[in-house]
Amino acid sequence: VTSQPERTVREDLLAAALALLDEHGPEALQTRKIAAAAGTSTMAVYTHFGGMPQLIAAITDEGLRQFDEALTLPATDDPVADLLATGIVYRRFARDRPHLYRLMFGSTSAHGINAPAHNMLAFGTAEIDAAVPSFAHLVRGVHRSIQAGRLRVAPNESAEQTDAAVVAAAAQFWTVMHGFMMLELAGYFGEADDEVYAATQILSPMTVSLLVVLGDTPERAAQSLAAALHQA
């Protein structure tokens, strides 16, 4: 009998772990359950990952890859609408896969093991794609919006300071999204099946306000939001 290639066994284990996480939460991430779901032995988990900390890191990496894939949207001629559409898809991913979302960003752990974190502000715009691909979507959106004259970030600073300001502005959008999502997933904004009210009363006004603070007009920001809702 020909044994399975090592890559396939590893992928099977990772897919099984993600499925268990999505369905049952981080408590289900146990070597026995993962191995059984993948149709292999518990030893395979250690053979292919080294241990649970490495497996949790691999789950996080794969989750972020899938998150990055979900956030990859076609560009339009309205960069602010594209930035907001990214936020809409961001929220959809987090609502659809709350256990993975919490694990990816360190708000929950699996048996006391947390996913590794990255300092987003340590990277410039040229490094973001390789370092943190999912965050890069926000950085590109902010950068395109600045180039289009919709946003203004450190206009009189040096190129290096402006580069850092672009990343920081993207982090402001991420902070709005992540803070909202954590409260929404915890149930503070109503029932899980009511996704409209909290978005229209809380998330949309916060996002438009941030756009205006960064230089956009309320009217253009509202128009871009309407376009983003149609686009995403």
Q: For each predicted feature, which ranges?
A:
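Helix-turn-helix
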Residues: 12, 20, 24-54, 58
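N-terminal intrinsically disordered/low-complexity leader segments
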Residues: 1-8, 19, 119-121, 216-232
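Amphipathic alpha-helical segments that line or abut small-molecule/effector binding pockets
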Residues: 80-99, 171, 204, 208
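Amphipathic alpha-helical segments used for helix-helix packing
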Residues: 96-122, 182-190
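Charged, low-complexity intrinsically disordered regulatory/assembly segments
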Residues: 190-232
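Amphipathic alpha-helical packing segments from all-alpha helical-bundle domains
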Residues: 111-175, 181, 199-212
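Amphipathic alpha-helical linker/stalk segments
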Residues: 63-85, 112-128, 153
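Generic hydrophobic, amphipathic alpha-helix propensity
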Residues: 9-17, 34, 59-67, 71, ...
